[in-house]
Amino acid sequence: MRIKFLVVLAVICLFAHYASASGMGGDKKPKDAPKPKDAPKPKEVKPVKAESSEYEIEVIKHQKEKTEKKEKEKKTHVETKKEVKKKEKKQIPCSEKLKDEKLDCETKGVPAGYKAIFKFTENEECDWTCDYEALPPPPGAKKDDKKEKKTVKVVKPPKEKPPKKLRKECSGEKVIKFQNCLVKIRGLIAFGDKTKNFDKKFAKLVQGKQKKGAKKAKGGKKAAPKPGPKPGPKQADKPKDAKK
């Protein structure tokens, strides 16, 4: 009985396995079958770049070069604008620069019976003068009433120049204080320089001058005593034991 049961069970299992295999195969479609039009297209997955870091570096480098180029162009544009402005300032004639001065000359402080004559020279400083000339007498006036010609010059004051720097004297005979001794030395030594330009020759010369000065000081004459009462003889000190 057991053997029959096992055989039947094996047959059932084989049948079930065959049925399941045939059902799965039936659902499969052939490879060359045409796809339906309404089916959604699968998304294209872009492959990941292995050298992504190098690509990013190249992009950054390109952007940097682009910004540097723009900055250079801006600088050149600004510089050209500045140069154009400088040229325009330089090319302004003196007649335009001295408009206010001319107006002041012709309107302010003009005496009666005189007219203002404004003159200027076309140069960098635009020097100008304001003269006053007497007007001609009217036709009905007498000849005796002639007015003397009067000219008044107003000169533009000169610009104050900065004082020149005094140069150090670097040649000729100099008196230099060296080791509390005034020594005259001829040579290229700047005044007040005590150590930098002293070489062996000058040091020897200084030593020789010092020795000569010391000898003269020793062999000099003694000063005469001042007139006055002579001091008396000093009294001898008494011994301490005499009191006892």
Curated annotation (Swiss-Prot):
Residues 225-240 are annotated as: 4 X 4 AA approximate tandem repeats of P-K-[PQ]-[GA]. Residues 156-168 are annotated as: 3 X 4 AA approximate tandem repeats of K-P-P-K. One of its GO terms (cellular component) is extracellular region. It is found in: Secreted. Residues 29-47 are annotated as: 3 X 6 AA approximate tandem repeats of K-P-K-D-A-P. Residues 209-224 have a biased composition (Basic residues). Residues 1-21 form the signal peptide. Sequence repeats lie at residues 29-34, 35-40, 41-47, 156-159, 161-164, 165-168, 225-228, 229-232, 233-236, 237-240. Keywords: Repeat, Secreted, Signal. The keyword Phosphoprotein does not apply. Residues 23-91, 137-169, 206-244 are annotated as: Disordered. This is Salivary gland SP38-40.A protein. It comes from Chironomus tentans (Midge).
